[in-house]
From Swiss-Prot:
Its EC number is 2.5.1.7. Belongs to the EPSP synthase family. MurA subfamily. The modification 2-(S-cysteinyl)pyruvic acid O-phosphothioketal is found at C120. The gene is murA1. It catalyses: phosphoenolpyruvate + UDP-N-acetyl-alpha-D-glucosamine = UDP-N-acetyl-3-O-(1-carboxyvinyl)-alpha-D-glucosamine + phosphate. It comes from Streptococcus mutans serotype c (strain ATCC 700610 / UA159). It comes from the Bacteria. Phosphoenolpyruvate binds at K23, N24. GO terms for cellular component: cytoplasm. This is UDP-N-acetylglucosamine 1-carboxyvinyltransferase 1. Pathway: Cell wall biogenesis; peptidoglycan biosynthesis. UDP-N-acetyl-alpha-D-glucosamine binds at R96, R125, P126, I127, D128, L129, D309, V331.
Length: 423
């Protein structure tokens, strides 16, 4: 398996970096492309990531034509023929987000069978909210041997209150409701930008989704949907990762195409820490002097709170800021695994249930470390840039799921990073 080697200690990032389309947006968009029975769906600004290839294969396995033009970052989907109702286990088992095909398949075919999904090992991440919502819409759910089978002649509009604003459940139920008989209201819905992006695509397809980005979603069912063109929203987590990278390396970086509104919680905490963050016509500029930064307390929350997908990267920033910072993780359990690896680099930290205390400001040392999940892999690479000596990061399969040419982009900004093949 590939490794990334970082020569750290004096890294100072300067220049411009271009942000890709959002991984967390394009995966449900591909699931939504199952719904139209007329016309083709063209997705633009698609990131070239292993998760995208996996989702393409999930959709192809349903007898849907999927053509990925990597040079143009476009995917053309044609689901106008009869589609299968069993999602391919070979690919579903690789990725958590693949569960979002359950709602679209069920809505279109009246029957769906999907295996329990795989992906990052971050907590239990139960899918009960998905299933409860579908049951409220009239689906009969069976779980046997790791498979989920859902049946409904036609889903019925329903009032659904979600116990937690789950992004995946909101996406699944929103897509299922587009072809339901009647009106569905989802309360305590997720409000992430990726939810808004999905709603925009569905509405272009002929759906009637109202209230995306608020706590209450209203979906008025339609009889059929059609293909359309849609450009994937920019990746706020990739943007945030490079903003943090600039902050922890005394950098001056323009993060091109980054959307200010989508990154507001992160920007607020960076400014509280003392980082200079400004909005420019082409993106967001980050300028930092680490010696002047202050420790902060951060609590992850569903959007519009601080994103859990930026938690690991922000703890890397906390590690270089003198004093004690606190990170409280409220969204997922078991998401501090990267701190164990960072301790190998000299970080002093304590973890008590959902809270990590980071004692920052001590010079870190390069070490051999292993990625534990997608965002942890980015955090370890960022930490390697500020640690003295050589850091080797393994298990890059996690990194490739969510970042395109990550080490190349950092190299162009001034980091000394290489990727090598083999064990």
């Amino acid at each position: 398996m590939d490794r990334i080697i970082i020569e750290g200690g004096n890294t100072q990032l300067k220049g411009e970096v271009v942000i890709e389309g959002a991984k967390n947006a394009v995966l449900p968009l591909l699931a939504a492309a199952i719904l139209p029975t007329e016309g083709q769906t063209l997705l633009k600004n698609v990131p070239i990531l292993s998760d995208v290839f996996t989702m393409n294969n999930v959709v192809r396995g349903l007898n849907v034509a999927v053509d990925f033009d990597e040079e143009r970052n476009q995917i053309l989907v044609d689901a106008t023929g009869d589609i299968l109702d069993v999602a391919p286990y070979e690919y579903v088992s690789q990725m958590r987000a693949s569960i979002v095909v359950l709602g679209p398949i069920l809505a279109r075919n009246g029957h769906a069978k999907v295996s329990m999904p795989g992906g990052c090992t971050i907590g239990s991440r139960p899918i009960d909210l998905h299933l409860k919502g579908l049951e409220a819409m009239g689906a009969k759910i069976q779980q046997t041997g790791g498979d989920i089978t859902a049946t409904a002649d036609r889903l019925k509009g329903a009032n659904i209150y979600m116990d937690f604003p789950s992004v995946g459940a909101t996406q699944n139920l929103m897509m299922a409701a587009t072809l339901a008989d009647g009106t569905t209201i989802i309360e305590n819905a997720a409000r992430e930008p990726e939810i808004v992006d999905l709603a925009n695509l569905l509405n272009k397809m002929g759906a009637r989704v109202i209230g995306a980005g608020t706590e209450t979603l209203t979906i008025i069912g339609v009889d059929k949907m059609h293909g359309t063109d849609h450009s994937v929203v920019q990746d706020r987590i990739e943007a945030g990762t490079f903003m943090v990278a600039a902050a922890m390396t005394n950098g001056n970086v323009l993060v091109k195409n980054a959307v200010w509104e989508h990154n507001r919680p992160l920007i607020s905490k960076l400014r509280e820490m003392g980082v200079q963050v400004t909005e420019e016509e082409r993106g967001i500029r980050v300028i930092s002097d680490v010696t002047k930064l202050r420790p902060v307390t951060v609590k992850t929350m569903p959007h519009p709170g601080f994103p859990t997908d930026m938690q690991a990267q922000f703890t890397a920033l906390m590690a270089v800021v003198k004093g004690e910072s606190t990170m409280i993780e409220t969204v997922f359990e078991n998401r501090f695994q990267h701190l164990e690896e960072m301790r190998r680099m000299g970080l002093t930290s304590e973890i008590l249930r959902d809270t990590a205390m980071i004692h920052g400001g001590e010079q870190l040392q390069g070490a051999q470390v292993m990625s534990t999940d997608l965002r942890a892999s980015a955090a370890l690479i960022l930490t390697g840039m500020v640690a003295d000596g050589k850091t080797t990061v393994g298990k890059l399969n996690h990194l490739d799921r969510g970042y395109y040419q990550f080490h190349e982009k950092l190299t162009k900004l001034g980091a000394t990073i290489s990727r090598v093949n083999g064990e």
